Regions:
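Active-site rim/adjacent substrate-binding subdomains
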Residues: 1-165, 170-187
Length: 187
């Protein structure tokens, strides 16, 4: 099993650079395969993360991963709404830790997104202890290459869409704190 990578923190310069595309011929290279494997281990080892972009581990590449825990969070939120139960702070990560699967997005491009934007809370592994509210598109569709170099299209809504947009921002050198309101510090 690969080792977890250190997560770079603001103000590390790689977080403010526009990431470079990965050549199709490099996707199956040992370097990229090892990076993806290490990113999965890194994300799994975080208590609060559901997404991780290559710049967050010091690699200026257009690559991010999202745990399928993001889908579980959407399912739980839908069930909560249907049952009219109020959300509590304990609901943020209410799932037993399990071996999540990961979506891998290489050279992602936004295909379409809803006009409707929704305000929601965000934090970031590269900006620890700071949270804020940010408006994001409610739905988004992204086209990318997977870890085998196969093109795919991924359309998501709600929390998963928010995570995709957050990770896409990382690839553009943007952090959530650049657009968030009501920033608060914890710890």
């Amino acid at each position: 099993m690969p080792n977890a990578l250190p997560i770079v923190k603001e103000p590390h310069p790689v977080l403010r650079k526009k990431a470079r595309d990965i050549a199709a011929s490099d996707i199956k290279s040992k370097k990229i395969k090892d990076l993806i494997a290490a990113m999965k281990v890194t994300l799994k080892g975080t208590p609060d993360g559901v997404g991780l972009a290559a710049p967050q581990v010091g690699e200026n590449l257009r690559l991010f991963i999202i745990s399928d825990e993001a889908e579980e969070i959407d399912r739980a939120e839908t069930a909560r709404r249907k049952s009219n139960v109020e959300r509590s702070s304990d609901d943020i990560k209410p799932y037993a830790v399990r071996d999540w699967s990961y979506y891998v997005f290489i050279n992602p491009q936004v295909v379409t997104g809803s006009q409707k934007k929704v305000d929601g809370p965000e934090g970031c592994l590269s900006v620890p202890g700071i949270f804020g509210s940010i408006k994001r598109r409610e739905k988004i569709t992204v086209q990318a290459l997977d870890e085998h170099g196969k093109k795919f299209t991924c359309g998501k809504s709600r929390f998963f869409a928010r995570v995709m947009q957050h990770e896409l921002d990382h690839l553009e050198g943007t952090l959530f704190i650049d657009h968030a309101t009501h920033l608060t510090k914890t710890g």
